């Protein structure tokens, strides 16, 4: 929606522009930061009224979402990612304040080797063209700052979704830079050729696509006989039954009211922001387990499918197990 918003703004189609901005804001609260910068860029380019209204809408939504809506829905807690910025504080206000009053901390993080690699891998595929349109590239700046100051390594890894908003600004700046530099047909052809070349080279070097050198590095699951066993096991589970399943199986068992990644709900893991409001084990009718992936959860699993555990195996093949809750059995208590 950010790409469409810019395109519509450049054509002064303000009604549809407002729709695109609304969709962008509805995607995630931090998309508002990019919306603020997009609005300011439009204001600088001469669309002052629309740009400032856009920036105000983005800022207002960000404050409403982070200060009111998320705490209200989370029992008073702010956004969970506030904990991802060690050295800057434990609340949104502290984080922003310390970034402003201690710029050296921000600079130190932003210039580390892995961050410089991140910038290179984001900009090199588009031939560094966005640097020729710095005003538009500002759309990417807030999310880039968030990503490179975060203590979560995946946020400054170009392969993950955390870079999606950054890339929106990068591609918009690429288009604007090429429009500015490619004013003649020859220049446009050269710029397009350079862009295609750098994109293909970067794809081969860094992407997991069929063209990439990383295609066979284990990113994609290869077809194997065990997959037929998994499909057979999944067919055993009724579509409305509550399930707790291994992490590689649970995506295939969603679209139901109760679907948990094992060891949830007995042992609360990756649940909520802080493990609050743990689910009820009584909602689990079936276990669907890949025994090869149990690790330190094996004792819990063996208790559940043991004589007093309450679950009886209905399917077991090649380490894939489906167990159904029996009418009687010992219930394992949830713990955190």
Please report, for each region that a protein language model flagged, where it lies by residue.
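Aromatic/acidic, Gly/Pro-rich catalytic loop(s) in extracytoplasmic/lumenal soluble domains
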Residues: 289-336
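Hydrophobic/aromatic-rich transmembrane helices and adjacent perimembrane loops
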Residues: 138-183
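Membrane-interface junctions at the ends of membrane-embedded or membrane-associated helices
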Residues: 10-17, 42-50, 174-192
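Membrane-interface alpha helices of multi-pass inner-membrane proteins
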Residues: 3-8, 15-29, 34-43, 57-60
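Transmembrane helix irregularities
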Residues: 9-10, 23-31, 43-46, 63-68, ...
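Signature aromatic-anchored transmembrane alpha helix within multi-pass, membrane-resident enzymes
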Residues: 56-60, 181-208
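Membrane-lumen/periplasm interface segments of specific transmembrane helices
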Residues: 48-140, 175, 198-202
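Extracytoplasmic
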Residues: 209-308
